[in-house]
Amino acid sequence: MLHKNGGLPIAIMDNDHVIAASGMSKREVLERRITKNLEELMENRSVHITTRDVPPMNAIEGLQRKANVVYPIVYGGDVAGAVALMQGDENHIPTETEIKLVQVAAAFLGKQME
């Protein structure tokens, strides 16, 4: 749904691996480990948003495609993973709508886990 509405690739991760993807080859990303940078972001319950001054984040090990927006999935005070809006074929600064879609998706998944 996020890929269809936003038009950019989406990845959903648990605390270790990519568990779902849309808009990019699933064989390319499923079961790949997340990077240490993403682990730290999730542990700190931080958010990553690419801007003109903030570069995209390397979120998935061994993948050249980087993440433009990352929100952690939090439920009951624990972090269960993250939702990432990945780069498309071109460099792209995410819009407010795209940022909000990722934020809502992460919040929704967190609520579903409670």
PLM regions: where:
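Short hydrophobic/glycine-rich mini-motifs in sensory/regulatory modules
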Residues: 73-83
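Juxtadomain coupling helices with adjacent low-complexity linkers
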Residues: 1-5, 33-39, 48, 82, ...
